[in-house]
Structures are given as structure tokens and as C-alpha cells.
């Protein structure tokens, strides 16, 4: 190429990159490519281009595959299954993102790389992590990106019937499932290879690679894709255009290489990040939302492409080798979670899954395992396949749907799958409803869980079907873990938009597909294409959450086989709905385990209000699920609590979906989600709720099912209110909403800081599941509801509070009454505040201590794991705390005062950190405040920084090793407080109550800081006082015997002691002063005395300021009596001369937390 051409290409590439960056900033629209149509650069080969060509093959070779993308063969190839395995093997977290990305990449890979798959696979094994992934992802993804998506979907849909037929066979083999449409034989061959060993799973993964060298890379890309799904895909779709332009382009794509640089550099980083799952988890979750929408479309194509790619069995060995290297460590890591998971879900159907997770679980459920035991070995491999197929969960979903259509053939594999399917299904519905809440957290966790589950599956899972379950269980577990890894706020934030988008699709899928899964295999298969895309979206979004829903479909098929519970689900739902209701209410961590099914039912109800089938079908398996869940409650409760909260919502819907075939699955996700601490409380809570609600649960579930659409926008609050109100049927009806609300609070607690945004997104997401049409309004309503719960929108809150208060009154007389009242309160509290949950728990605990315990658990999650520790440390403690708090909050809960119900008590860490730790935190908060534009919010953040600066000074003061004095820290903090108070003048005519409350907090901080400054220098001040007093006496005596020097001294000192001098000796002193002034020009005050006087005045003035400012704060606080009375009650009042810095810090933080809640600033 001549220079001009290259310059033109460079310009174009720059434009593309700019476009990509802009698109990355905006949520990448799924349909719009990051780059313009790819072009091929024909120029002499260089190392990079030659390596790319060797990896991806010639464009001519790939051209045919690109053209044949729509061919069913490609669809039939189970390659998508393989990429997931590779992804799973790579890493749990990596797996999550890779799942999303790998779906896309797998879909893309079949397009171009198939011919060169073996070569590219071999090289890919070497370059898999870095170069290869870039090229392969770019080449195969680009080739298949635009057309691949459509073709894959079309081929997938076209092969829907065939895939269903073969899907049954494929259900046995996850690969066949993922590629259910086209190649059962290829799948079986792959399956057989899988059954050979985990290496077979690796093999399948390699096979995917061989099919599309880009696939492994696609997996690599998937992380970056997850962030840039559309952008990356565009970039990868870029290669197809390049291919079309010329075959040589692959050899040296100048533009191709450059775009790849951006994406690929991102991908390798992501892959490394994936491998370092923790570090990558956050970025992944953040990136996932933007990429999820794109992933949806991309995922669908990946299924057919993956299927075609899996055709190359010869490359499997190479790929297997690659897989083996990358997989073993992840498998090990995943196995541990798996073992934990199984204990959580001891269900026969899930036994295979559980067996994957842990032998203990398998033994626990030996009956199912007898059939699953032998399957377990093959299933481990199949599970790995499933993991990869989970990557293309949409494909799996279709395949699974097919198996459902043919439950008979799928029956045996289905049983194993049913476990996986239940889990996946639970996750699916939970992802529909709970996913909205746990959105990206769930996704990242789900994906990591999937990878983990797949790996455990390899170790001890039945055939392909358990792996999806394991994935699900692991996904749940991972979700729990990942949210922690990923800052809940960031993950939630990123998830909120994407989750909402997903929820639309997820809702459509969840209501349509999820319901189809639940209601019947036939429905699922028909809905599979749409569901696949949506599922894929959610899968990418939720890392494995949505993909799991396809897996769930598989398991659902098995479930159907088990009890044809999907069709019966509706029927059973009526009977079991009560349990669902019970479980829902107890869904708050305390009852999560036992009420997991119900919680999921509730979640399902929320998410699937449109499709009552889903709820009903979910509820049908609840009885067994309930029992099993009770068993696993302790285990699950032992699991991280935060996990429970995020996943509880997801597990709620999931459980409702998967409960019928195996309540075990819901249990598993729940137990994963449920931390140890809430278990005791949860169990008790669940038992209480069961007793109270079991009779009415059916009505409850049914009523929510029928009612949700009508009140759906306000359903969360209204339902809670109704539940609180009516002890009988009405109560039951409202209970599911409570579950929803509880799920929302749990989510909120999980992401206390991102509560507002997440609540809106979560509620919106669930609502989206219920009603796509109402999605926007619903998401708004959740926000308003959250705000209302915060007390800012008292109208809806008051309505619900009135209803809940009335219900509470009604319920209080009856044993069930207290629980419902508590639940509504708790729900309100959690809604109003993540931390408010504890206060709401208190109020709810008034009616039911156990319930309050569960609420407290959720609130603790929001508060921090510290609270969880406290809650878990003893349910009794929780109960005791609940009563005490209930004494504070019970009136507020019934009244639903905007302040009390939403006012939750923060849980403070008693550990002592270094001064640097607090200093860094303070600086971070201050910088955050500097960037804000809203003056009130800025002031709140500044005061928050002030509190951290005070903590820093306190640490300096307490730590003997600290050489620095805290005095400068306190002194500068006072200056910051003064600046903060200038932002919002409480005397201004437009000053609000919040402004005045904030001012009182500022004044009290300032006053106690002045007092502290005085006390730090008090010893010096006493010395100065003695010295100055002596000097003044001497100067006074000297002034009486006039002498210029003494006179001048007397003149210098009189002002401090002027009161003493003026009364008795005013005449003499005056004369002395006058004489001194007359002759004083030559007389000087000793410099030492002058300095002492200045220092003395400065130190004592601190005390004067402290008293004056304290009085000012006390006067102003009288205007905000309710707020500060409640704050004093919760935290203990601040006492001017007795409160220490720690008391001030906690008091102020609690007040700031409530101010944020009132102002809806909590995110």
C-alpha cells in the first residue's frame, strides 16, 4: 500500500476508534457497530499479520464459513457449549464475563475461523490468553458479528424443531444442548470426548477454539466485550468485513490490527483480570452492563456458530490441552464453592449438581445420585461442556427447551439436568426478577458461579445436565462472592441500566421463556429464539445468570420429566404458593433458606406477574423445596449474607421457577446467597412464616399473580401494605409483594451506597419482568417507592404504611399477625433505607422478633458484613436487638413515619485502623464532594469527609506510635466545617429542614472539635495562666510605683486582667497607664509574656467558641426535634463535656445517613 492509502486507512481507523470510545461511553446500542464496515488492507505481510493469518486462517477459507453462517450446520455445531467450558476453565470471574463475551465470540467464531480452527486452535492454545484471543475474537467475531447474530438466530430458530429433537440427545450432553439444533452426533462425539475426562471439556473448549481460533479469544474478548460488547463485536465484526473485502486482509489487517489493539489490549487485560477474578470482577461488572445489550444479539449467533465450531473434534485434543492448563486452578477454586453449594441445596434432583459441588452433598442425596452417580462421571465432563454451553446459554435454552418438548427422551439426562436446570431456572427467573436487583452483581457472580459450577461438575457432576445446575449453584455462590469483590455500588450501578435493559428482555424471556420453561418445554422451544437472545443478553449481563436460565430450561425439561412440574407448576403453584408466600416473607435472610422457595416465588411473582404460570409452577415444587431448603437453611445462612440478599431476589424467582422439579435448586442458590449469620434467624423466621402463611400462601401467591399487573407499578409497596394489612387471604395476597419488597431491600442492603440507583433498577427490573410496557414507569415507581420508603414520598409510603399499620393491628392479635406486620415494616425499612432495614427490623421485630432478625440480616448486609457478623453471631442477639429497636421503630413502622421506618441504624466497625487509612478515606470523600454540583449533597459529602478527618485525628491521638499531633488535623477540620456551613446557610429564607439538620450536625462537630482543641492544649494553658497571673500581679504592683518599664508592662497586661485592675485601682492604674503611654515608647513587654498571653488567649478562646457553638446547635436542634430525638435515641445523645470523638463520629455518620436517605442521595 502506498502512504496515501495508509494515511487514509489510519484516518478511518482513528475515526473508528473514536466511534468505539464514544459508543463505549454511551451504552453500546446492540445494533450499532463500534466501527464502520471493516475493510481489508492489502499490503506486504508482517509478523503480526502472518500470525493472525495462521491463527485465523485465510480470508478465503473463512469466506465460506461466513457465507454459511446461516447454514443450520453451524447452528447445529455445539461450539457455544465449548467456548463456555473454555471460559469456565479460564476462571470463575473470567468465566462470567467471558460467558457474555464468549457467547458472542462463540457465535462469531464459527463464521470465519472454522476451516482454520485446528491450526488456530493449536496456536490459540499458545496465544489463547493474548494474541490469539485478540485475533480469533476479532476474526471470528467480526466475521460473524453482524450477520452471525441474525444467521445464528435464524438458524437457531429454523433448527428449533430439529434442535429440540436432537436437543434431547443434547440435553444429555451440554454441548449437544448448546448446539441442540444441528449436530447431535457431533455433540455426542464431543460428549464422548468430554466423558473421557475433564480434558474432554478442555477438548471441547479447544474444539471451540479450533472451530474458531477466535473463540478462545472470543472468550478473552468476552471480558472486553462484556464491557464493550457492541464495540468489541463491532471490532470483531470488523474482521468479517475485512474478510469480505479480501482474503489477504486477515494476513495483515492494518486497520484490523489497530482496532484489535484497542480491543485486544483490553481483552488480554480483561483476561488477565478475569484470571485475577477479584480484580477483574469489578471492572467486569461495570463493563458488563454496557456490553450486555449487545451480547444478547451476539450470544444468539454464537450458539449456531459454536455448534458449527464444535464440529471439529480433531482440534479438541489441542484445545483440551489448552483448557487443561488454564482450567485446573479455576476448577480447584470452583470446587470449594461447589462443595459449599451442595450442602446448601440437598435436593435429589440437584444431587448430581450437588455431587459436582461436593461429595457430601452427593452422599446426602444418594437416592437421586444412584442414577446420577454413574452419570456424575460422564456428567462432570458434560458439566464442563455445559459450562461452555452455558456460555451460549441461549443455545442451551433452546436445546433445553427442545428436551422439554421431548421430556421422555430427556427424562434421564433431564433428571440430572433438572438439577442444573432448576438451578439455572431459578437463576433465570431470579435473574429476571432478582437479576434486576442483583443485575450485574448477579451476572458477574452467576458467571463466576457458572464457571465454578462447571468445574465442580467436572469433579463430581452427573452428565451434561448437572453442570448447568452446578453452574447455577456456583453462579449463585459466585454472585454472592463477586458482589463482594465488586463494589456493590459499582456493580449495581453498572448493572442497573443493563439490568433494566435485560429485564425488558429478561422479562420477556422470563415471562415468556422462563414461563415457557416452567409451563412447558414446547413453549420454551418456541420462545427459545427470543429467549435465547434475551437469555444470552442476560447471560452476558449476569455473567451466567441469563445463560443459566437456558440451563434452567434444560433442567426444566428434566424437571418436567421428573414431575412434569412445569405444566403442573401452575396447579402446584396454587397449592404451594402459600409456602412461596411464607418463604417470600421469610425471604429476608432469616427465612431465606426455608422460605427460599417462597421468596423465589415472590421474586418470580414479581418478575413473572404477567406469567402466572411461572409463579404457580414455581410454587408447586415448593413443599419439597421448603423442606430441603430448611435443611439447607443453616448451611445457606452460613454462607455470605450479602450473597443472599442479591441472590435472594434472584433465587426467589429462580426457586419459584425451578422449585417444582427440585426445590433443591432454589435452596442451593439461596443457600449460596444466604450467609451463615441469618440462617438461624432465617430458619426461625421461615418456620414462623410458614406456620402463619402456609394456610394463606396459596391465596397469597395466586392473588399476587393475578394482582401484580394491575398494581404492578406500585406493586412492591402496595403488595407489602396489603400483606401487612390482611392477616388472612388479603394478607397472603400482599405477602408476595412483601417478598418482592424484601428482595428489593436485600438488594439494597447489599448495595447500601448504591441503594437509590439499584433500588430503582432492581424494582424496575423486576417490574420489567412483569411488564415490559410498564418498565419505564415501573422503574420510576421503584425509585419513587424507594423514595417513599425513604419517607420523601409519604403519599405512597403512607398509603402502604397505613395499610401495613392496619394489617399490623389486625395481624398483631394473631400469631401470624406479628410476622406480617414485621415483614411490611422490614420491607418498608429496607426500601426506605438499606440501613434503615435494621430500624425497620426493629419495628418489625416488635411484631415478630424472628422476622426482625431476618430483616436485620438484610439490613446488616446493607450496613456491612459487620452487621451480618452480629446477626449471625446469634439469632437471639438479633431478636433481642429487634425488640429493642422495635420498641423504637414499632410506632414508626405502623405509622410509617417517613423518618422512622426508613431510619435504619448503621452498623459501625469497632476495629481500629491507622490514621493513614482514615486520612485516605477522608481525602477521597472530599474529592468526591469537590466534584459535586448540588450544594446540599456537596455539604453532606464534606461533612462526611470531616468525620473521617476527625477519625484520623482520633487515631493520631490514640496511637502512641504516631509522632504527629492531632491538633493540626482537628484545627484544619474545623476550617473545613466552616467552609461546609457556608455552602448551605440555615438562616437563608429558602433553607430546608435538611439544611438545618445538617447545620446542627456541623455545629456539634465544630463545637466538640473546639473543645478537643482546648483539651489538647489545656495543660499549656494552665501554665500560661499561672505565669501570666504572676506577671500581672507584678506589673500591677510596679504600676502603682510608677516606672516606665513597669508601667508599660502594666499597660501590656491590663487587658486580660483589666476587670481586676479597673475596679479597685482604676485610678492608679489609669494614671500608671497614662504615664506609661507617655513615657512608654521606650518600654516594652517581654516577648515571652506576649507570646504566652497570645497562646493563652488562643487556647481559652477554643473553649469559649466550643460553648458558644454548642449553645447555637442546641437552639437550632430544637427546631428539628423529631429528627434529633430519634437520633439521640438510636445513637445516644451527645454531651458537651463528656462525649468522645468516637461518639461524635458515629452520631454524625448516623445523622448523615438519615439525611442522605431523606434526600434520596443514597446510591
Swiss-Prot record:
Its main location: nucleus. Dephosphorylated at Ser-549 by the PNUTS-PP1 complex, promoting RNA polymerase II transcription pause-release. InterPro entries: AF4/FMR2, AF4/FMR2_CHD, AF4_int. GO terms for biological process: regulation of gene expression; response to endoplasmic reticulum stress; spermatid development. The modification Phosphotyrosine is found at residue 712. There is a cross-link at residue 583 (Glycyl lysine isopeptide (Lys-Gly) (interchain with G-Cter in SUMO2)). Keywords: Acetylation, Chromosomal rearrangement, Chromosome, Disease variant, Dwarfism, Isopeptide bond, Nucleus, Obesity, Phosphoprotein, Proto-oncogene, Transcription, Transcription regulation, Ubl conjugation. Residues 599-612 have a biased composition (Basic residues). Residues 115-128, 227-251, 273-285, 350-375, 403-412, 488-501, 510-528, 549-560 have a biased composition (Polar residues). It is found in: Nucleus; Chromosome. Ubiquitously expressed. Strongly expressed in heart, placenta, skeletal muscle, pancreas and to a lower extent in brain. The modification Phosphoserine is found at residues 120, 212, 387-389, 392, 487, 490-491, 549, 671, 680, 694, 703, 706, 814, 836, 1043, 1055, 1058, 1062. The modification N6-acetyllysine is found at residue 822. The record marks 350-351 as: Breakpoint for insertion to form KMT2A/MLL1-AFF4 fusion protein. Pfam families: AF-4 (PF05110), AF4_int (PF18875), AFF4_CHD (PF18876). Belongs to the AF4 family. It is linked to A chromosomal aberration involving AFF4 is found in acute lymphoblastic leukemia (ALL). Insertion ins(5;11)(q31;q13q23) that forms a KMT2A/MLL1-AFF4 fusion protein. This is AF4/FMR2 family member 4. It comes from Homo sapiens (Human).
Amino acid at each position: 500500500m502506498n502512504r496515501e492509502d495508509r494515511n487514509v486507512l489510519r484516518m478511518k481507523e482513528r475515526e473508528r476508534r473514536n466511534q468505539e470510545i464514544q459508543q463505549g461511553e454511551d451504552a453500546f446500542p446492540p445494533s450499532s457497530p463500534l466501527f464502520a464496515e471493516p475493510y481489508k488492507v492489502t499490503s506486504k505481510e508482517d509478523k503480526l499479520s502472518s500470525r493472525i493469518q495462521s491463527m485465523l486462517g485465510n480470508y478465503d477459507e473463512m469466506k465460506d464459513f461466513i457465507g454459511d453462517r446461516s447454514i443450520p450446520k453451524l447452528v447445529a455445531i455445539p461450539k457455544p457449549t465449548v467456548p463456555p467450558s473454555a471460559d469456565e476453565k479460564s476462571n470463575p470471574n473470567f468465566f462470567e464475563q467471558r460467558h457474555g463475551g464468549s457467547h458472542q465470540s462463540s457465535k462469531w467464531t464459527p463464521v470465519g475461523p472454522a476451516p482454520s480452527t485446528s491450526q488456530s486452535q493449536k496456536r490459540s492454545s499458545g496465544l489463547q490468553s493474548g494474541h490469539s484471543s485478540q485475533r480469533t475474537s476479532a476474526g471470528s467475531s467480526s466475521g460473524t458479528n453482524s450477520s452471525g447474530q441474525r444467521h445464528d438466530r435464524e438458524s437457531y430458530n429454523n433448527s428449533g424443531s430439529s434442535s429440540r429433537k436432537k436437543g434431547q440427545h443434547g440435553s444429555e450432553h451440554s454441548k449437544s444442548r448448546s448446539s441442540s439444533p444441528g449436530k447431535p452426533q457431533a455433540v455426542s462425539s464431543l460428549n464422548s470426548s468430554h466423558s473421557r475426562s475433564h480434558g474432554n471439556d478442555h477438548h471441547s473448549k479447544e474444539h471451540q477454539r479450533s472451530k474458531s481460533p477466535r473463540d478462545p479469544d472470543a472468550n478473552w474478548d468476552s471480558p472486553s466485550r462484556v464491557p464493550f460488547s457492541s464495540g468489541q463485536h463491532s471490532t470483531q465484526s470488523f474482521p468479517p468485513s475485512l474478510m469480505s473485502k479480501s482474503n489477504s486482509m486477515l494476513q495483515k489487517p492494518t486497520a484490523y490490527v489497530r482496532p484489535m489493539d484497542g480491543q485486544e489490549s483490553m481483552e488480554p487485560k480483561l483476561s488477565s483480570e478475569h484470571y485475577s477474578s477479584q480484580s477483574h470482577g469489578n471492572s467486569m461488572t461495570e463493563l458488563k452492563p454496557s456490553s450486555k445489550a449487545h451480547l444478547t444479539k451476539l450470544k444468539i449467533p454464537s450458539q449456531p456458530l459454536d455448534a458449527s465450531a464444535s464440529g471439529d473434534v480433531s482440534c479438541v485434543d489441542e484445545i483440551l490441552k489448552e483448557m487443561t492448563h488454564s482450567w485446573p486452578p479455576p476448577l480447584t477454586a470452583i470446587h470449594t464453592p461447589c462443595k459449599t453449594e451442595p450442602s446448601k441445596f440437598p435436593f435429589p434432583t440437584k444431587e448430581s449438581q450437588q455431587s459436582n459441588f461436593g461429595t457430601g452433598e452427593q452422599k446426602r442425596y444418594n437416592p437421586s445420585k444412584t442414577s446420577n452417580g454413574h452419570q456424575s462421571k460422564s456428567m462432570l465432563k458434560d458439566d464442563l461442556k455445559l459450562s461452555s454451553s452455558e456460555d451460549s446459554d441461549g443455545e442451551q435454552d433452546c436445546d433445553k427447551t427442545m428436551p422439554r418438548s421431548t421430556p421422555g427422551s430427556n427424562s434421564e439426562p433431564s433428571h440430572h439436568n433438572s438439577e442444573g436446570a432448576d438451578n439455572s431456572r431459578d437463576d433465570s427467573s431470579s435473574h429476571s426478577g432478582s437479576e434486576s436487583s442483583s443485575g450485574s452483581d448477579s451476572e458477574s457472580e452467576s458467571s463466576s458461579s457458572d464457571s465454578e459450577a462447571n468445574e465442580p461438575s467436572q469433579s463430581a457432576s452427573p452428565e451434561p445436565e448437572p453442570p448447568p445446575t452446578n453452574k447455577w449453584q456456583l453462579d449463585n455462590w459466585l454472585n454472592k462472592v463477586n458482589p463482594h469483590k465488586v463494589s456493590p455500588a459499582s456493580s449495581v450501578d453498572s448493572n442497573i441500566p443493563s439490568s433494566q435493559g435485560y429485564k425488558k428482555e429478561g422479562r420477556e424471556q422470563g415471562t415468556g421463556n422462563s414461563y415457557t420453561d416452567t409451563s412447558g418445554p414446547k413453549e420454551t422451544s418456541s420462545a427459545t429464539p427470543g429467549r435465547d437472545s434475551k437469555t444470552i443478553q442476560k447471560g452476558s449481563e449476569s455473567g451466567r445468570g441469563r445463560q443459566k436460565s437456558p440451563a434452567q430450561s434444560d433442567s426444566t425439561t428434566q424437571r418436567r420429566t421428573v414431575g412434569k412440574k412445569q405444566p403442573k407448576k401452575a396447579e402446584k403453584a396454587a397449592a404451594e404458593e402459600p409456602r412461596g408466600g411464607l418463604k417470600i416473607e421469610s425471604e429476608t435472610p432469616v427465612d431465606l433458606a426455608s422460605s427460599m422457595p417462597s421468596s423465589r416465588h415472590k421474586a418470580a411473582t414479581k418478575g413473572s406477574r404477567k406469567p402466572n404460570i411461572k409463579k404457580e409452577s414455581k410454587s408447586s415444587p415448593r413443599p419439597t423445596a421448603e423442606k430441603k431448603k430448611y435443611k439447607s437453611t443453616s448451611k445457606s445462612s452460613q454462607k455470605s449474607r450479602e450473597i443472599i440478599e442479591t441472590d435472594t431476589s434472584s433465587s426467589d424467582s429462580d426457586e419459584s421457577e425451578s422449585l417444582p422439579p427440585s426445590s433443591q435448586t432454589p435452596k442451593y442458590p439461596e443457600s449460596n446467597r444466604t450467609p451463615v449469620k441469618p440462617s438461624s434467624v432465617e430458619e426461625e423466621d421461615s418456620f414462623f412464616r410458614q406456620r402463619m402463611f402456609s394456610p394463606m400462601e396459596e391465596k397469597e401467591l395466586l392473588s399476587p399473580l393475578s394482582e401484580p399487573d394491575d398494581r404492578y407499578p406500585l406493586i412492591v409497596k402496595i403488595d407489602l401494605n396489603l400483606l401487612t394489612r390482611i392477616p388472612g387471604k388479603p394478607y397472603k395476597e400482599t405477602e408476595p409483594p412483601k417478598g418482592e419488597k424484601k428482595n428489593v431491600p436485600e438488594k439494597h442492603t447489599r448495595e447500601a451506597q448504591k441503594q437509590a440507583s439499584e433500588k430503582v433498577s432492581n424494582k424496575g427490573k423486576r417490574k420489567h419482568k412483569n411488564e415490559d410496557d410498564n418498565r419505564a414507569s415501573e422503574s420510576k415507581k421503584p425509585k419513587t417507592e424507594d423514595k417513599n420508603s425513604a419517607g420523601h414520598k409519604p403519599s405512597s409510603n403512607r398509603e402502604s404504611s397505613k395499610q401495613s399499620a392496619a394489617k399490623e393491628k389486625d395481624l398483631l392479635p394473631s400469631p401470624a399477625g406479628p410476622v406480617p406486620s414485621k415483614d411490611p415494616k422490614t420491607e418498608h425499612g429496607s426500601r426506605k433505607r438499606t440501613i434503615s432495614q435494621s430500624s425497620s427490623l426493629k419495628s418489625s421485630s416488635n411484631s415478630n422478633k424472628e422476622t426482625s432478625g431476618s430483616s436485620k440480616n438484610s439490613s446488616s448486609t446493607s450496613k456491612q458484613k459487620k452487621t451480618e457478623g452480629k446477626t449471625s453471631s446469634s439469632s437471639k442477639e438479633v431478636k433481642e436487638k429487634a425488640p429493642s429497636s422495635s420498641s423504637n421503630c414499632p410506632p414508626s413502622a405502623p405509622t410509617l413515619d417517613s423518618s422512622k421506618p426508613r431510619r435504619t441504624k448503621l452498623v459501625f466497625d469497632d476495629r481500629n485502623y491507622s490514621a493513614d487509612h482514615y486520612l485516605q478515606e477522608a481525602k477521597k470523600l472530599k474529592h468526591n464532594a469537590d466534584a459535586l454540583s448540588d450544594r446540599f449533597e456537596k455539604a453532606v459529602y464534606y461533612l462526611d469527609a470531616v468525620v473521617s478527618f476527625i477519625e484520623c485525628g482520633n487515631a493520631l491521638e490514640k496511637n502512641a506510635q504516631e509522632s504527629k499531633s492531632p491538633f493540626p488535623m482537628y484545627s484544619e477540620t474545623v476550617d473545613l466545617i466552616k467552609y461546609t456551613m457556608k455552602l448551605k446557610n440555615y438562616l437563608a429564607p429558602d433553607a430546608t429542614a435538611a439544611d438545618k439538620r445538617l447545620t446542627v450536625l456541623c455545629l456539634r462537630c465544630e463545637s466538640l472539635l473546639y473543645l478537643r482543641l482546648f483539651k489538647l492544649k489545656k495543660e499549656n494553658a494552665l501554665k500560661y495562666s499561672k505565669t501570666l497571673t504572676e506577671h500581672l500581679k507584678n506589673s500591677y504592683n510596679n504600676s502603682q510605683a510608677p516606672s516606665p518599664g513597669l508601667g508599660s508592662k502594666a499597660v501590656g497586661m491590663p487587658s486580660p486582667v483589666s476587670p481586676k485592675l479597673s475596679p479597685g485601682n482604676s485610678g492608679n492604674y489609669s494614671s500608671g497607664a497614662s504615664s506609661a503611654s507617655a513615657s512608654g515608647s521606650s518600654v516594652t513587654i517581654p516577648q515571652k509574656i506576649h507570646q504566652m498571653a497570645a497562646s493563652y488567649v488562643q487556647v481559652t478562646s477554643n473553649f469559649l467558641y466550643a460553648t458558644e457553638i454548642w449553645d447555637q446547635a442546641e437552639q437550632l436542634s430544637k427546631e428539628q426535634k423529631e429528627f434529633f430525638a430519634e437520633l439521640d435515641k438510636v445513637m445516644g445523645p451527645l454531651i458537651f463535656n463528656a462525649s468522645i470523638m468516637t461518639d461524635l463520629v458515629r452520631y454524625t455518620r448516623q445523622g448523615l445517613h438519615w439525611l442522605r436517605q431523606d434526600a434520596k442521595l443514597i446510591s
